[in-house]
């Protein structure tokens, strides 16, 4: 597979207010490091110099984040109003994301909900990594929830592998990678949370891809499906042999799922009160005044947890 380049940028959605790109793997979104010759910011500036905004730090308003090693859908707001509209969707938990991944081993269950709380790893030598609650050095674990559906079983370079669809219901740093590792099925090619191998035929990339994205803003619904990169025609090392669930059917189900009501100020997915039965739920909170800058802080912190891997 060809590495990324400044000239090679795939656009999967464009409107007056938004762009959605299909980010190449092993490409940072932005960086202040002079040695970074390839970033998504530089790709955008090369393709769309007229869209760069000098009032922003990097020239473009990225609505969310993807890890350096992760490929797939990433939304860019083209003006301040559009960025605010996307921000409200994230704040109100109305954004839907789904990822494709190749995981080590054959997962026997057809569907799994992973609910390990995730916190920072303070263990020496594990800086900038995350871990599940109960692990040595786990600090400030927060509730985390991921739905997993097994699509196919097969072999990758002769080793058993499962192709899965992952839907994060919370947004912790490295959530999908940590949850899959905790399940005993790390992402193929994940050198941080998977098995470190000295084999020369190790995968050329981490097999995690942001496949589906839906942001129902006030003015338009930004919805995209990016091409599936985990096909035998694209990677000869991947050889599926058993189909368990149709990806097309899952996409149809994702598209048919109604968006949450923005007026519903109920608990966030995975929060304790969200799991209470109907009669036991607390009454709805009173109408709140407009959000202040101080009140925006917690949500901005939440958004920052869809974080990039640190420069190294």
UniProtKB/Swiss-Prot annotation:
GO terms for molecular function: pseudouridine synthase activity; RNA binding. Disulfide bonds: none annotated. InterPro entries: PsdUridine_synth_cat_dom_sf, PsdUridine_synth_RsuA/RluA, RluA_PseudoU_synthase. SUPFAM superfamilies: Pseudouridine synthase. The keyword Amino-acid biosynthesis does not apply. Keywords: Acetylation. Coiled coil: none annotated. The modification N-acetylmethionine is found at residue 1. Residues 279-289 have a biased composition (Pro residues). It comes from the Eukaryota. GO terms for biological process: enzyme-directed rRNA pseudouridine synthesis. Gene3D superfamilies: Pseudouridine synthase (3.30.2350.10). Residues 256-298 are annotated as: Disordered. The keyword Phosphoprotein does not apply. The active site is at 67. Belongs to the pseudouridine synthase RluA family. This is RNA pseudouridylate synthase domain-containing protein 1. The lineage of its organism: Eukaryota, Metazoa, Chordata, Craniata, Vertebrata.
